[in-house]
């Protein structure tokens, strides 16, 4: 490998000759060999591409950056957004907690690439300075949180929400399709009064509907950008009106409703917006875990479990037991949910680390957030495609378990009283007989009365 010499305020550094990054990026590569290289999320790099381009335009509009430099910076940023420079961002999550080295990685790459675009060569002094031009009116302290918000907002709106909505729609369709399938209910994992399979699935659809609403309700806070606060939130070294103008450009370039933060001190020192939105992702994970767990239990069997629903058989389930098929989509979903719950713990703790004017756990918050948002999206699509759409009732099993249930006796409460109804249920359970047999044997009802009063289809109410 050949090298060139780059300089920063601490001296000279050898840098791979064919790479656009410079001294500070190389120092970070050497100082933080923690985990796989280039673990900084690609979404963060993309977000920096938007904000650096927006900053160049805002600085030009406000008279502090020449148009020639604006256009060269913007051209380099467009290449980042077009994925043409993906191999130029080698840094890891585990670096300074402000994300300073990643900010400088972007500054250096944009600076050197702009110089080459202008006809220069790597190793020459660039006509675009990484700090004075690319980072003009900025600090790592306001750029990295801005990149966090851009990346998180885009991921949630463009990826997570549509994928969860897809699964929610399928579950709502199943609720309607199963509205007349009467089955036994269960509370405390024990038999309870009847409901319809449609009512059961309507709860799942409603859970995701509420989760989506909660997620969308967090977006206005996440749309507020720290850019313009610079080092501690005061806006030092920015031209008047820069914060509003740069947010407007980011909104224009992304097509999303970003605005400047109401309070820059809050935007730098805390990341409550990220904690808040990830809390809604956690809510969805809690709901999805319950849904997937219920479905795998309802499908358990095929002969010795509950077996009230049939789910698609996608692959062999055992290397030793021939013919075994497992609820693999449910297991994958519940593992994803466990990961999201763990990520929420990390993000919540990281959110507490806003010491005075700066939170210094930014990269780990960003990485965990983006992983959660993507995993939930992928898991919802997989679960929908390979499980939910293929769920069907197992009618014989549903009927048998409904007929065998002792909790149908609840319908007799208003006719013979709770204590007499309990006596029928306990006697039938003890003797292994039916409710009807014991109700008649005990002389508490006639056969005709039992048939009239104990009708599962009349016990499910009118609620959908």
Curated annotation (Swiss-Prot):
PROSITE patterns: FUMARATE_LYASES. Involved in the TCA cycle. Catalyzes the stereospecific interconversion of fumarate to L-malate. The active site is at residues 188, 318. The record marks 331 as: Important for catalytic activity. The keyword Repeat does not apply. GO terms for cellular component: cytoplasm. It catalyses: (S)-malate = fumarate + H2O. PANTHER family: ASPARTATEAMMONIA/ARGININOSUCCINATE/ADENYLOSUCCINATE LYASE (PTHR11444), FUMARATE HYDRATASE, MITOCHONDRIAL (PTHR11444:SF1). GO terms for biological process: fumarate metabolic process; malate metabolic process; tricarboxylic acid cycle. There are 2 substrate-binding sites: the catalytic A site, and the non-catalytic B site that may play a role in the transfer of substrate or product between the active site and the solvent. Alternatively, the B site may bind allosteric effectors. Pathway: Carbohydrate metabolism; tricarboxylic acid cycle; (S)-malate from fumarate: step 1/1. Belongs to the class-II fumarase/aspartase family. Fumarase subfamily. It comes from the Bacteria. It is found in: Cytoplasm. Keywords: Cytoplasm, Lyase, Tricarboxylic acid cycle. Substrate binds at residues 98-100, 129-132, 139-141, 187, 319, 324-326. InterPro entries: Fum_hydII, Fumarase/histidase_N, Fumarase_C_C, Fumarate_lyase_CS, Fumarate_lyase_fam, Fumarate_lyase_N, L-Aspartase-like. The keyword Lyase applies. Its main location: cytoplasm. Homotetramer. One of its GO terms (molecular function) is fumarate hydratase activity. Pfam families: FumaraseC_C (PF10415), Lyase_1 (PF00206). SUPFAM superfamilies: L-aspartase-like. This is Fumarate hydratase class II.
């Amino acid at each position: 490998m050949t090298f060139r010499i780059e300089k920063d305020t601490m001296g000279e550094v050898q840098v791979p000759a064919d790479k656009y990054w410079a001294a500070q990026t190389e120092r970070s590569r050497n100082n933080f060999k923690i985990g796989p290289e280039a673990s900084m999320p690609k979404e963060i790099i993309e977000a920096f591409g938007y904000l650096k381009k927006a900053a160049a335009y805002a600085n030009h509009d406000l008279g502090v950056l020449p148009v020639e430099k604006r256009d060269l910076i913007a051209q380099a940023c467009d290449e980042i957004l077009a994925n043409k420079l993906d191999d130029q961002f080698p840094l890891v999550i585990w670096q300074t907690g402000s994300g300073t080295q990643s900010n400088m990685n972007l500054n250096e790459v944009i600076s050197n690439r702009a110089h080459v675009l202008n006809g220069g060569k790597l190793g020459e002094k660039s006509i675009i300075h990484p700090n004075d031009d690319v980072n003009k009116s900025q600090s790592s302290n306001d750029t990295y949180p801005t990149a966090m918000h851009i990346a998180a907002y885009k991921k949630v709106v463009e990826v997570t929400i549509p994928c969860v909505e897809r699964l929610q729609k399928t579950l709502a369709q199943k609720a309607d399709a199963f509205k007349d399938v009467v089955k036994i209910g269960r509370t405390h994992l024990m038999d309870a009064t009847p409901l319809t399979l449609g009512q059961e699935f309507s709860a799942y659809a409603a859970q995701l509907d509420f989760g989506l609403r909660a997620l969308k309700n967090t977006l206005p806070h996440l749309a507020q950008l720290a850019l313009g606060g610079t080092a501690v939130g005061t806006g030092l070294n920015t031209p008047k009106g820069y914060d509003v103008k740069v947010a407007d450009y980011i909104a224009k370039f992304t097509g999303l409703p970003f605005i400047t933060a109401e309070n820059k001190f809050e935007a730098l020192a805390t990341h409550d917006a990220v904690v808040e939105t990830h809390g809604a992702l956690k809510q969805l994970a809690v709901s999805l875990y319950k849904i997937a767990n219920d479905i795998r239990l309802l499908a358990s069997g095929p002969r010795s479990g509950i077996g009230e629903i049939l789910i698609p058989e996608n692959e062999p389930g055992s290397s030793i037991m021939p013919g075994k098929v497992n609820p693999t989509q449910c297991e994958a979903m519940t593992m994803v949910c466990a990961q999201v719950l763990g990520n929420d713990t990390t993000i919540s703790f990281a959110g507490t680390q806003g010491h005075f004017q700066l939170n210094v756990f930014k990269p780990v918050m960003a990485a965990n957030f983006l992983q959660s948002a993507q995993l939930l999206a992928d898991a919802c699509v997989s679960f929908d495609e390979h499980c939910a759409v293929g769920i069907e009732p197992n009618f014989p099993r549903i009927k048998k378990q409904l007929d065998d249930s002792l909790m149908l006796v609840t319908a007799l409460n208003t006719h013979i009283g709770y204590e007499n109804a309990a006596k029928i249920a306990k006697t039938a359970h003890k003797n292994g007989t039916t409710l009807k047999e014991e109700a008649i044997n005990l002389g508490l009802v006639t056969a005709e009365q039992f048939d009239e009063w104990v009708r599962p289809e009349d016990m499910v109410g009118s609620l959908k």
